[in-house]
């Protein structure tokens, strides 16, 4: 109808409505709905643009939660998908893996203590891993310590090498930030069998804090899935494409970890953030696949 009136400007709204078989009121209601829809889409895309500045790879489900939480925009998942697709804003996952574990070092290793455990609180199981970043032609490494219950990154260190002193710094950061209500309760430390985690100094630090030491049994990703998943999110959703100098890398990682911890909702955390669950200890949805039966970890720590 709008096209008709553009071609024939002398045709009145009443005449055009009669030609198409609907009333003038219905025409203006439809026009208003189209206008309101256009305004709503613009508002959604504007909010998505702001969110994506901090969370460049955030997907539809999490965007839906953040739009409602931070912008009071209630939009259906399918509608949001269509809006994002039409705007060319859908993202593809980046999947690459580089080996950072070298276990042929001859140092003592420890058994896997957590394959029969489902954590019931924060600071019950900490999982660790190392990921790499390619910066200005060099490989840099990020050492991460993650609370298994809340998925919160509680310790980290950026370095240009894989020595154990960097892993020690990440672990010390985790100790400094422990939730006070769990500080006197036992913690299991789970890692792969890399030399950093088997070194004399690192093991001494764990024992000084009365940690139970747990390690993977091999290359099975089921042995340390949470650490690998969190590392992948930090690296692929927040750090790539990595356009930063060596001097600015640590701050870039710091901002990425803050965005992940404090702003990104998790499906397995009832769409809460890791920081919220770590601080409050709220119950979580165990939506990841568990290959092992449930056991009380206090029996292991005694």
Regions found by a protein language model. Give the residues of each.
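A short acidic/small-residue loop/turn micro-motif
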Residues: 147-148, 158-163
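Basic, flexible linker segments flanking DNA-binding modules
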Residues: 17, 24-122, 273-285
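RNase H-like two-metal-ion nuclease catalytic core shared by retroviral integrases
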Residues: 101-103, 191-193, 199-204, 213-235, ...
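Mobile-element integrase/transposase regions
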Residues: 73-77, 81-144, 168-173, 177-186, ...
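Conserved, non-catalytic sequence blocks in retroelement Pol enzymes and Pol-derived host proteins
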Residues: 57, 71-72, 118-120, 135, ...
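Short, amphipathic alpha-helical "recognition" segments used to contact nucleic acids or chromatin
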Residues: 1-10, 45, 49-53
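C-terminal domain-tail junction helix/linker
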Residues: 207-211, 233-302
């Amino acid at each position: 109808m709008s096209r008709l009136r553009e071609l024939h400007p002398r045709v009145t709204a009443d005449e055009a409505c009669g030609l198409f078989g609907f009333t003038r009121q219905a025409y203006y209601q439809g026009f208003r709905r189209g206008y309101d829809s256009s305004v709503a889409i613009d508002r959604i895309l504007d909010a998505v643009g702001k969110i994506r500045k901090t969370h460049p790879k955030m997907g539809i489900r999490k965007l839906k939660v953040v739009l409602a939480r931070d912008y009071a925009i209630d939009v259906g998942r399918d509608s949001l998908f269509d809006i994002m697709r039409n705007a060319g804003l859908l993202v593809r996952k980046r999947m690459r893996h580089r080996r950072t574990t070298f276990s042929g070092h001859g140092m003592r290793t420890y058994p896997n203590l957590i394959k029969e455990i489902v954590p019931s609180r924060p600071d019950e199981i900490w999982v660790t891993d190392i990921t790499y970043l390619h910066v200005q032609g060099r490989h840099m490494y990020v050492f991460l310590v993650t609370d298994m219950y809340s998925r919160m990154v509680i310790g980290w260190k950026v370095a240009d090498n894989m020595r154990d002193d960097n892993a020690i710094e990440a672990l010390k950061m985790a100790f400094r930030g422990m939730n006070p209500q769990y500080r006197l309760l036992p913690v299991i430390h789970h890692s792969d069998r890399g030399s950093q985690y088997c070194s004399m100094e690192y093991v001494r630090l764990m024992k000084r804090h009365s940690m139970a030491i747990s390690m993977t049994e091999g290359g099975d990703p089921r042995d340390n899935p949470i650490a690998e998943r969190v590392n992948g999110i930090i690296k692929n959703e927040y750090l790539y494409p990595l356009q930063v100098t060596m001097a600015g890398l640590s701050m870039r990682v710091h901002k990425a970890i803050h965005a992940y911890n404090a702003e990104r909702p998790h499906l397995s955390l009832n769409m809460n953030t890791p920081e919220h669950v770590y601080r409050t200890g709220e119950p979580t949805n165990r939506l990841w696949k568990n290959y092992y039966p449930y056991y009380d970890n206090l029996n292991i720590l005694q």
